[in-house]
Structures are given as C-alpha cells and as structure tokens.
Design a protein with these regions (language model features):
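Short linear motifs embedded in intrinsically disordered, charge-biased segments
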Residues: 1-243
Length: 243
C-alpha cells in the first residue's frame, strides 16, 4: 500500500469516528530505538499470548501454525490413540481436549477465508481417520465421510466449534459492560460492516434471532440463553460458572 493510499484510509477512518460522535485521538509518531541506541527494525510478525500477529492483520500464518502444532500434539499421543481397549467416544473426548484445544486456540478472533477453512477441516479429517484407523469403512465398503467420523467420535464440526467459541467470547465481552475495550471494538466491527469478521458475526446473530448489539447485550445477560442456542445443556448439581 502506497503512502497516499495509507493517508486516504486514515482520513476515512477518522471521519467515521467523528460521525459516531467519538473522540479522535491524535497519536504522535515517535522513533523507536533499541537498548544499544540503534533504530529498531520493524518486524513482519510477532508472538503475543501464544498467537502469531501478522503485520497485515491476516489470520493465515497463525492458522498454518496451529495446524502444524495440532499435528505435532496428535503424534505425541500416538500411544494413546493406538490403545485398543479405549472406546472411540473416550478417544474423541481426549482428542477434543488435547488436539482441538491446540488447533482452535484463539480462533474466536480469526478472519477465516474459504481456503483456510478447507485446510482446517481437511487436517481435522486426516487426524480423525488416523485416530479411528484408515481401514474403517461403512456398510457399502466406502471410506467414511467426515460426518460419519464425527458421529463415531462424538465430536462437533470445525465450523460449529469456531462459531461457538466466537459467540461465547463475544457474549463474555458484552457482559463486561459498554466501557470494555474489546466490546467497543466488536461493536465497531459490526456496525461499520467493512470487516469480514464483523459481517460474519452479524450473520451469526441473525441466525440466533438477534438484530442489534443492544439486543445481543440484553440476551446474553441470561447465560442459559446462549447455552441453549448452542445446543448445550447445563449439568444438574453444578453451580454457574463465573466470567
């Protein structure tokens, strides 16, 4: 992106902020230096809280990194997957706890392209086939489909898990109040309608019967509402979880 294009984009964003009645903060540009007095070089990406942050704001590098880490985790547990005495449902629960937690870490904030989603689903399917055994086939002697594998292991699809994580995180931010910085950013993403992440979140809200950010705030005050919408059932005898 050229310098003129960057200035034009900043001017457009500043105008949008003023139109919303928000205060525009002018940040003075400073020269960052390293400890030894030399000018620090800009990096293309860096790790923050276990996630790879890309200079362009793309989720692609982090998704590829997550796929690699999940595969490594799966291989470390190969002795567990090879145990014949373990029921498939139990293996599925272990797979969800150890592999899905690595594969989908921080996925609630990803902006996923169709190609990246195919990569996630494809790797998940590959690992599940390794888990149940490549020779396992259905009654027609055909290779098991993804839906059949998910049913055998008692797992949800990758698309459903990412959607659930995103909605749960957004609900948590909404319950923290209007002054929460994360919630302010979410509202901006949804109302501007310029980001794919915000557009997809708005579509998820519509599927749940929510038409606005205010409506979402009112709905998620009742934690049981979102749990029921996501197909979860509260276990009796357990107290409510705190945010």
């Amino acid at each position: 992106m050229s310098e003129s294009q960057l200035k034009a984009r900043r001017a457009t964003r500043a105008k949008a902020v003023l139109e919303r009645g928000e205060k525009l903060f002018e940040v003075e540009q400073v020269e960052v230096r390293s400890c030894n007095g030399g000018v620090a070089k800009a990096c293309g990406s860096f790790l923050y809280l276990g996630s790879l942050t890309d200079k362009k704001g793309s989720s692609g590098p982090e998704i590829r990194r997550r796929i690699k880490k999940a595969t490594e985790t799966f291989r470390r547990l190969w002795r567990v997957w090879a145990m014949k005495g373990l029921p498939l449902k139990l293996k599925g629960r272990l797979y969800s706890a150890f592999v899905h937690s690595v594969l989908l870490y921080n996925s609630e904030v990803w902006t996923i392209t169709e190609t990246e989603m195919k990569a996630l689903v494809g790797r998940n399917g590959y690992l599940m086939r390794r888990l149940v055994g490549e020779v396992v086939r259905n009654a027609d002697d055909k290779r098991l489909t993804e839906s059949q594998l998910l049913e055998m292991l008692g797992l949800a699809s990758i698309q459903s898990l990412i959607r659930m994580r995103k909605l749960q995180w957004v609900a948590h931010c909404a319950r923290r109040g209007e002054e929460d910085l994360s919630w302010k950013r979410i509202v901006r993403e949804v109302e501007d309608g310029k980001s794919k992440w915000g557009t997809r979140l708005k579509e998820d809200w519509k599927e749940l019967g929510v038409k606005s950010t205010r409506g979402w705030c009112n709905k998620v005050k009742d934690k049981g509402w979102l749990a029921s919408k996501l197909g979860k059932s509260k276990k009796k005898g357990k107290g409510k979880k705190k945010d």
